[in-house]
Amino acid sequence: MPSTGTLVIIFAIVLILCIMLLFFYKTAEAGKSGVLPPPIPPPTPPPPKKKYDHNEYMEKTDLEPEVKKNHRKWANEAEHLISSSVKGLENLDETAFLANHKGHGFRTFDHAKSLFKEFLKKY
């Protein structure tokens, strides 16, 4: 019967051969195509949002025919009035503003001036 030292050496050699065989098997397997996991696909982009179609919206609404026909013209007129009044306010003199609003809840002249300046900043 072989001695203990010889058995340990034989066991170590067998263990090293098994590890080498396992390593060789893994590297050979990794070289094959199709063994690696498939690549992660790129994220799919969200579906495109449907563009707002005003004419389609107006067809679906149950407005009177006159409103459906003239709503765009009325909206343009209102927008023009608002923009022109805001432009007029930008050129308005502070004294005219205060004269028109005298006695309408302003505590002092400075309070009225500060409110007027805040109003102009908003528009």
From Swiss-Prot:
Induction cue: Expressed in the late phase of the viral replicative cycle.
Disordered: region residues: 32-53
Cell compartments where the protein resides: Host membrane; Virion
Membrane topology reported for the UniProt record: Single-pass membrane protein
Biased composition (Pro residues): 36-47
Superkingdom of source: Viruses
Keywords: Host membrane, Late protein, Membrane, Transmembrane, Transmembrane helix, Virion
Keyword Secreted included in the entry's annotation: no
Gene Ontology CC: one annotated term: virion component
KW Transmembrane (keyword) present: yes
Membrane-traversing stretches: 5-25
Family stated for the protein in its record: Belongs to the asfivirus CP123L family.
Protein name as annotated: Uncharacterized protein CP123L
Species this chain originates from: African swine fever virus (isolate Tick/South Africa/Pretoriuskop Pr4/1996)
